[in-house]
Each structure stands twice: as C-alpha cells, then as structure tokens.
Amino acid sequence: LGLSCKRIQFTTDTLPSDITGFTMFNRETNSFEYRDGAANCQLLLADEINRTSPKTQSALLEVMEEHTITVDGKTHHLPSPFICIATQNPLGFAGTQPLPESQLDRFMVCLSIGYPTLEHQMNIINAQRYQNPLQELQPATTAQNVIEVQNYLTSVQMTEDVLRYAILLCEATRNHPLVELGISPRGVSALVKMAKASAIIRGRNYVIPEDVQNVYTDVCAHRLVLRPQAQADGKDAGMILQEIMDDIRPKAER
C-alpha cells in the first residue's frame, strides 16, 4: 500500500509502552523527550494479539478509535491514514486469552483464512523455487490514494430503505435469545461503511441490499457474545447471523 509499516509481536511480557511509546529524560537537553512506539505508523500489524495481557491490549483502544496516543498527558496524532491489522491464535492455544468486547468492536472485520487449497499450495511452493517472491513485491497504491478512497465512501449513495435494512439486521442480534451482547452502534456504522466499500468494488456508487448481505457476517460475527445455550445447540455466530438474514428480507423482497 505504500504506507509506513510496523509490526509488534504480542507476548505475555509485552508492555503498553511498547505500543504507545514513552517519555524519557534527556540529560543533554535537560528535558523529557517522547520516543515512538509501534503504533506510530500508518499500517500497524499486531501479531498474535490475544497472547498478551488485557492491560497491554487496552493500549490499542485509543489508537484504533481516536488515531491518537496519549502519553504522560500529552496527545500525539498518528499519521493518516492509520490502519491496524491483527492476527490471533484460536482460544485454547498456549498463552491465549479472549479479547475484551471493547477491543473486538474496534476491528471493522474479522476473517478466517484457513488452509490454502491444493492448487494454491502448489503455486506457493513453485513461486519460491528459484527466488524469494517477496523481493518482487511493489506497492500497489500510495497513502494519498488510500485516503482518497476512504473519503470517496461519503459520496456513495445509500437509500433510507437499505439503511433501515442494515440497522434492522443489527437490531435483531440484540433481541436474539441465543445472543448475550448484540451489535453496537459502532458495529452498525462499520456495516454501513463496508457495504459502501462493497459497492465501490463492484463498480457502483450506490448500495444495494446484496452489498449489506455480502459483508454482514464478516463485520458482525466477531462482535457477538453468545449465551451458553448457543454452544449447547451447536450454533456459532455465523449460523445465527445467517438465520437473521433469512428472517429479515429487504423491502423489495417482502
């Protein structure tokens, strides 16, 4: 993407200051100076984010929501655009613990890549036969282009009926008998933005119900907190969201 990038490996001893940075006294200047942390970049990769303590994870809350860092009472603005991508291990792996709901809600989408297919694995191996393919990578765009695309979202049209449909899908999670915690207003906003992005990818400047449906599970599944009865019934968040989509249809299909 042509962005400045930093990666931080989360472990049990990772400190909040590793993310936010810290101030230290400079004897030469006789003053305190701020030293950047991992979050001072345009693209932050938080690797194995669920292997660190809740205190360290909380250091990302302001970073992801406000795009600022506050250290010793002084606020530092992050460069634009700012994007945070994280990986996590399945719960049950050594040293893992669940992420707090407030942090999960700040991630716009959650994707599970899974294993590559046989064909993809062959392509991966063949690509490394003679040289490292990473050395051939070139930026596909620039930081300015990313900002322009983000700003273009505001011009994508969304009718009241489609907006109401998106909100109804989210509201249904709050009243579902198997859901303890449903989609928050932040989640609704993320669904609308992703639906607009889906429309742009498909060459349209307006959103249709299919755009909302295409991103609904990826945007909402990780935000749900299910009741114990859901596991007893053999249902996960994706199944519940699919049931909601089956029950609530767009206005034109009613």
Language-model regions: role of each:
Residues 1-11:
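Walker A/P-loop
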Residues 5, 43, 83-84:
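Hydrophobic/aliphatic anchor position in the core parallel beta-sheet
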Residues 19, 60, 107, 166, ...:
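Residue-level signature of catalytic and energy-coupling elements of molecular machines
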Residues 25-45:
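Conserved alpha-helical scaffold flanking the Walker A/P-loop in AAA+ ATPase domains
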Residues 26-31, 51-56, 64-156, 196-201:
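Canonical AAA+ ATPase core
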Residues 47-48, 59:
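Walker B catalytic acidic pair
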Residues 136-191:
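Conserved AAA+ ATPase small/helical "lid" subdomain
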Residues 175-254:
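C-terminal engagement/docking regions of AAA+ P-loop ATPases
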